[in-house]
Swiss-Prot record:
Impact when changing residue 815 to A: Abolishes G-protein-mediated cAMP release
Record-given protein name: Adhesion G-protein coupled receptor G6
Post-translational modification: Proteolytically cleaved into 2 conserved sites: one in the GPS region of the GAIN-B domain (S1 site) and the other in the middle of the extracellular domain (S2 site). The proteolytic cleavage at S1 site generates an extracellular subunit and a seven-transmembrane subunit. Furin is involved in the cleavage of the S2 site generating a soluble fragment. Processing at the GPS region occurred independent of and probably prior to the cleavage at the S2 site. Proteolytic cleavage is required for activation of the receptor.
Keyword terms, alphabetized: Calcium, Cell membrane, Cleavage on pair of basic residues, Disease variant, Disulfide bond, G-protein coupled receptor, Glycoprotein, Membrane, Metal-binding, Phosphoprotein, Receptor, Signal, Transducer, Transmembrane, Transmembrane helix
UniProt-reported outcome of changing residue 819 to A: Abolishes G-protein-mediated cAMP release
């Protein structure tokens, strides 16, 4: 008993804890291993280099892991990752445990040991590594290292070669240095050591190694050498005697020169000075030389140091622009980008603290020019007043940023004290703190961004040095401005920002420790009016831009400052209303600088620039040649931009250029010529009643004095464009117009980016563009046309060129090409086109390859139009006759072929009627009516194609698949396909696109009246018309061949016909089927190239007469149709009695022979000479057939028996029992 009790007791304790053990085991399996002490495996890695491993490495990784490592680098870098160790559970397709690598372009999965020792690069500046494990089998995992690799030159400096035979750092061969009469040159440099020796930082020389431009240091001091003139710069450099301008940290130096001033501008350490150098007046630096960094002479060494961000412009910048020059202003001659340089790898060194490097998220691109002067064209940099302590400022990126800083944002001043334990250089401390601030506020719940970060100096310090504590511990005081955009009205207290920074203290770089943090919100400047008429609202410290009250398009500005020692104290700075007082010439010159070569203008920039120029033009009553030249150069620079960027502002730009030409001052001269690189303008005075100007031409100059040469007299030998005005140009002008006619304006466009047709039918512009206008009036419908001769942009054969003018009102005022009133003259050739136009505007030559109807000459167009209208009229009449015949006589429409023929005739009838009415309806200029006609024409064209295809399908069923074929509701299904399919296609087109883009007026000739309501979109045309017909056409060809094989096979068995009779019968069958199945529409496929015109004639003749041929072969020549006509329409001896032999023959279903089948095979093809027989006998009944009048002929018929099976019967000399036929 005791034993039992013990056993029972023992068993009791054995099973009692089992539920707990089960839960514990489940917990072990399900809880991620990081709970037991392994590191977190969902992190973002943004350090320049480092390592990461699988959880618990080098021990086995836990079960059920889902890890993600996001590796990020700044713009301009990629990430390279290397797997030093790799051991993950192996399985097919890595279905259990796996590591997935996403490089930005593709995703790759690894398992087993496949990735060990391999390296992978990201496609951009971010890479994702994910790792997952299942519930069983653990392995060692992986160990990976990563590093940033610089791919942008902005992140790399150049180590200058110290010997001429070491290597050369030069501008790439693809970059051509232009001839320079002025330049601005900026670069940053460092110098190693304190040797007082001569050196050269850069040199520019010709092919014979003659120095053309160089900068360096000689015994006499720092110099800039231009050609053979050496200009000393010591007086402009704020350095002591024998002190190097460059030290161990980078300093930027900018040099400015203009050959008309005789002085050198030097901008160094935010100080701009000029030094005289009269020997450089009128000198020009030749182009196509070789630019090197360092020295190209053996006797002079290169600067012993590094160079960075070397940029060169072929124009001058003033002190204000240079003081605000940002990293994103690209040099238009040479820029610090890989494409501009040929640099050996050993000369490059990547660093993360370069001034224009992208070690953080980059700021928006700054604009070149004074923002206060240019209004909305760019955003000014906020400058601190002179009363504030000096700062060293670093631009900071935006964290969770929006596109522009908002004035309603809340601004905080963050003051941090950093302990510099390892005594890092101040530049490095600044960089590390910047990274730390960026990472701290990245992906925060509040939308904030840091404006800048700076070292703060207390009063009395003359250098940027550290503050030292009592323990002589080096500390740095840094200030940063943080902007909070309270988009959701959520309050952000300063202590929350402070706690966020303190919490992230550990992420600071080694050797740096956060000592204290202080966050204070900045105050507001009060609203006020100063001076009168200028109202400044209450804002936080920032710049506020106010439109000039009496000068639309220009603006005044004022800055709200905060007190450095007490951020709650704010005050307004002085009002800058200089822009409101500027003359148009000064503003135009500033805009010209903004558009100078090399500037990367966006579409928004161009739109703003055009708007500014438009305001200048509208304001000025008379524009002198100086201002006009500046404005034309602005437009010329704009034309160098991409076509996509020009599209939005093209219409306004063209209107402004026209207005500019009209306002050019001619009081002191009879004509004005302005030439630029991409644009030329010529304006000449003109008196009514005279022929002072009979022609104008523009061509390339005989020398290099200007871009183009313009001539109003004899013309040039081979001009790019010329205009010949008719002698009666100014006749019959009204008195009002005569007053306005005082000038003629001609504008030539070398670049055609402003002429982009966004309409659905986009033709290709193959010539330059020439604009002509007389005063400010509209002249059209000239008795004698204006002759415009325009060169093609490329010498090539342009088949059927189209002369067109630019219609500013087309395409919802975006503009588009219009051919009305212009035709191409026969004197045109491969290199140029001669256009004759009856009005004035912007003229160009287009090429429209696929649809060439509008490219025919006037004679062929008239002939083809005449043939089409006459043919369609005849076709409509006889299609109506065919349809009326079958509708009127009930006996004719009992069989299926007759019903199919009726539907085909209906589609043809409406197609021809709509075609005849289309041109007349177009003349009403009612868009809705034109679209409706085009839609109906499209529908009935597709319906015609469809019913021709159904004819072919029916013949195949009747002649080839003759046994055991039964289709319920045969005609109903054909009607659904015949009318429903075209309706579906047209409905889809109408639903998927704007009706105005698909259907509308289309020009199909060169005369003004050659317009047609039809499909405008070429894609819709080729898919729904050409493609649709192509399918039906090839189907009909296949059916045509099959049917003809059947006919010829049966007719070939007859022995009582001569060869001539056999050929004629087969030929008649071919002709009747050709028109019935629409085979003549296939001529369209051959209307290309030299055979274009002949096949267009064949196409027009046969297809416009299709209704006539169908009437002849499938109505008039049918015996049962003739019988009905004679019975009901004829009188006297021509009338046929109802009980005639002919009638009996047909009524008793005595069929003609297969040659008669061929004779009238058709839509009424099968059994066409009699009605179809629907047998009333049972399937077991016997049917006998009567002998035909031709005893040797075999008659052929199809009929449907009661059960619905299609039957085939033969009639011969002997009565044959065929069964249930």
């Amino acid at each position: 008993m005791m034993f039992r009790s013990d056993r029972m007791w023992s068993c009791h304790w054995k099973w009692k804890p089992s539920p707990l053990l089960f839960l514990f085991a489940l917990y072990i399996m399900c809880v991620p291993h990081s709970v037991w002490g392994c590191a977190n495996c969902r992190v973002v890695l943004s350090n320049p280099s480092g390592t990461f491993t699988s959880p618990c490495y080098p021990n086995d990784y836990p079960n059920s892991q889902a890890c993600m490592w996001t590796l990020r680098a700044p713009t301009g870098y990629i990430i390279q990752i290397t797997f030093n160790d790799f051991d993950i559970e192996e399985a097919p397709n890595c279905i259990y445990d796996s590591l997935s690598l996403d490089n930005g372009e593709s995703q790759t999965k690894f398992c087993g040991a496949t990735a060990k020792g391999l390296s992978f690069n990201s496609s951009a500046n971010e890479m994702h590594v994910s790792f997952s494990s299942d519930f069983s089998i653990q392995k060692k995992g992986f160990n990976a290292s990563y590093i940033r690799v610089a791919v942008s030159l902005r992140n790399q400096k150049v180590i200058l070669p110290q010997t001429s035979d070491a290597y050369q750092v030069s501008v790439a061969k693809s970059i051509s240095i232009p001839e320079l009469s002025a330049f601005t040159l900026c670069f940053e440099a460092t110098k190693v050591g304190h040797e007082d020796s001569d050196w050269t930082a850069f040199s520019y020389s010709n092919a014979s190694f003659t120095q053309l431009l160089s900068f360096g240091k000689a015994k006499s001091g720092y110099f800039l050498s231009i050609s053979d003139s050496k200009c000393l710069l010591n007086n402009a450099l704020p350095v002591k005697e024998k002190e190097d301008i460059f030290a161990e940290s980078f300093e930027q130096l900018c040099l400015v020169w203009n050959n008309s001033l005789g002085s050198i501008g030097v901008n160094f350490k935010r100080n701009y000075e000029t030094v005289p150098c009269d020997s450089t007046i009128s000198k020009v630096i030749p182009g196509n030389g070789k630019l090197l960094l360092g020295s190209n002479q053996n006797e002079i060494v290169s600067l012993k140091g590094d160079i960075y961000n070397f940029r060169l412009w072929n124009f001058t910048m003033n002190a204000k622009i240079l003081s605000n020059l940002s990293c994103n202003v690209k040099g238009n001659v040479v820029d610090w980008q890989n494409d501009f340089w040929n640099i050996p790898n050993l000369a490059l060194k990547a660093e993360s603290n370069l001034s224009c490097g992208s070690y953080l998220i980059p700021l928006p691109a700054a604009e070149l020019a004074s923002c206060a002067d240019l209004g909305t064209l760019c955003q000014a940099t906020v400058n601190s007043p002179s009363t504030t302590p000096p700062t060293v400022t670093t631009n900071m990126p935006v964290t969770n940023r929006i596109d522009k800083q908002r004035n309603d944002g809340i601004i905080y001043r963050i003051s941090v004290v950093i302990q510099n334990i390892l005594r890092h250089p101040e530049v490095k401390v600044q960089s590390k703190v910047a990274e730390w601030l960026n990472s701290t506020f990245q992906n925060w719940n509040y939308t904030v961004y840091v404006v800048n970060i700076s070292f703060h100096l207390s009063a009395g310090e003359d250098k940027i040095k550290v503050k030292r504590s009592l323990e002589d511990e080096p500390r740095l005081v840094l200030w940063a401005l943080l902007v909070y955009n309270a988009t959701n009205n959520t309050n952000l207290e300063g202590k929350i920002i402070q706690q966020k920074l303190l919490k992230n203290n550990e992420s600071l770089d080694e050797g740096l420790r956060l000592h204290t943090v202080n966050v204070r919100q900045l105050g507001h400047c009060l609203a006020m009016e100063e001076p009168k008429g200028y109202y400044w609202p209450s804002i936080q410290p920032s710049e506020y831009v106010l439109p000039c009250p009496d000068k639309p398009g220009f603006s005044a500005s004022r800055i709200c400052f905060y007190n450095a020692t007490n951020p709650l104290v704010t005050y307004w700075g002085p009002v800058d209303i200089s822009n409101c007082l500027k003359e148009a010439n000064e503003v135009a010159n500033q805009i010209l600088n903004l558009t100078a070569d090399g500037q990367n203008l966006t579409s928004a920039n161009i739109t703003n620039i055009v708007e500014q120029v438009k305001r200048i033009v509208n304001k000025e009553e008379n524009i002198d040649i100086t201002l006009g030249s500046t404005l034309m150069n602005i437009f010329s620079n704009i034309l160098s931009s991409s076509d996509s960027d020009l599209l939005e502002s093209s219409s306004e730009a063209l209107k402004t250029i026209d207005e500019l030409a009209f306002k050019i001052d001619l009081n002191s001269t009879s004509h004005v010529n302005i030439t630029t690189r991409n644009l030329a303008l010529s304006v000449s005075s003109l008196l009514p009643g005279t022929n002072a100007i009979s022609n104008f031409s523009i061509g390339l100059p005989s020398n290099n004095e200007s871009y183009f040469q313009m001539d109003f007299e004899s013309g040039q030998v081979d001009p790019l464009a010329s205009v010949i005005l008719p002698p009666n140009l100014l006749e019959n002008l009204s008195p009002e117009d005569s007053v306005l006619v005082r000038r003629a304006q001609f504008t030539f466009f070398n670049k055609t980016g402003l002429f982009q047709d966004v309409g659905p039918q986009r033709k290709t512009l193959v010539s330059y563009v020439m604009a002509c206008s007389i005063g400010n009036i509209t002249i059209q419908n000239l008795k004698d046309p204006v002759q415009i001769k325009i060169k093609h942009t490329r010498t090539q054969e342009v088949h059927h060129p189209i002369c067109a003018f630019w219609d500013l009102n087309k395409n919802k005022s975006f503009g588009g090409w219009n051919t009305s009133g212009c035709v191409a003259h026969r004197d045109s050739d491969a290199s140029e086109t001669v256009c004759l136009c009856n009005h004035f505007t912007h003229f160009g030559v287009l090429m429209d390859l696929p649809r060439s109807a509008s490219q025919l000459d006037a004679r062929n167009t008239k002939v083809l139009t005449f043939i089409s209208y006459i043919g369609c009229g005849i076709s409509a009449i006889f299609s109506a006759a065919t349809l009326l015949t079958y509708v009127a006589f009930e006996k004719l429409r009992r069989d299926y072929p007759s019903k199919i023929l009726m539907n085909l005739s209906t589609a043809l009838l409406f197609l021809n009627l709509l075609f005849l009415l289309d041109g007349w309806i177009t003349s009403f200029n009612v868009d809705g009516l034109c679209i409706a006609v085009a839609v109906l024409l499209h529908f009935f064209l597709l319906a015609t194609f469809t019913w021709m295809g159904l004819e072919a399908i029916h013949m195949y069923i009747a002649l080839v698949k003759v046994f055991n074929t039964y289709i319920r509701r045969y005609i109903l299904k054909f009607c659904i396909i015949g009318w429903g399919l075209p309706a579906l296609v047209v409905s889809v087109v109408l639903a998927s696109r704007n009706n105005n883009e698909v259907y509308g007026k289309e020009s199909y000739g060169k005369e003004k009246g050659d317009e047609f309501c039809w499909i405008q979109d070429p894609v819709i045309f080729y898919v729904t018309c050409a493609g649709y017909f192509g399918v039906m056409f090839f189907l009909n060809i296949a059916m045509f061949i099959v049917v003809m094989v059947q006919i010829c096979g049966r007719n070939g068995k007859r022995s009582n016909r001569t060869l001539r009779e056999e050929v004629l019968r087969n030929l008649r069958s071919v002709v009747s089927l050709t028109f019935l199945l629409g085979m003549t529409w296939g001529f369209a496929f051959f209307a290309w190239g030299p055979l274009n015109i002949p096949f267009m004639y064949l196409f027009s003749i046969f297809n416009s007469l299709q209704g006539l041929f169908i009437f002849i072969f499938h109505c008039a020549m049918k015996e049962n149709v003739q019988k009905q006509w004679r019975q009901h329409l004829c009188c006297g001896r021509f009338r046929l009695a109802d009980n005639s032999d002919w009638s009996k023959t047909a009524t008793n279903i005595i069929k003609k022979s297969s040659d008669n089948l061929g004779k009238s095979l058709s839509s009424s093809s099968i059994g066409s000479n009699s009605t179809y027989l629907t047998s009333k006998s049972k399937s077991s009944s016997t049917t006998y057939f009567k002998r035909n009048s031709h005893t040797d002929n075999v008659s052929y018929e199809h009929s449907f028996n009661k059960s619905g099976s299609l039957r085939q019967c033969f009639h011969g000399q002997v009565l044959v029992k065929t069964g249930p036929c």
